[in-house]
């Protein structure tokens, strides 16, 4: 798996965590098997007795859908920003003014 594939898989795992409640059962099943359990398209197709192309199309469309949700709701983006601020805050415990700035930024995310 290349670096780009790994980054995409990690991103899709996060997006799935954030937006799975907005997906149909079939969409959830396909994404979970493909991205979380590392099933191949053929394995998923065999499991659900459909073609590889049907699985591929569903995964691609569902991936586009969760990306669309993210562009509108930005849950993952805000999560990443909060995580970044948390790490900066841990490093700034002895710098109260800097810590206050990070807290303000964190509050603005809500």
Curated annotation (Swiss-Prot):
Name assigned to this protein: UPF0122 protein SERP0802
PANTHER family, per the entry: UPF0122 PROTEIN CBO2450/CLC_2298 (PTHR40083), UPF0122 PROTEIN YLXM (PTHR40083:SF1)
Protein family membership: Belongs to the UPF0122 family.
Function: Might take part in the signal recognition particle (SRP) pathway. This is inferred from the conservation of its genetic proximity to ftsY/ffh. May be a regulatory protein.
Pfam families in alphabetical order: UPF0122 (PF04297)
Gene3D superfamilies the record matches: Winged helix-like DNA-binding domain superfamily/Winged helix DNA-binding domain
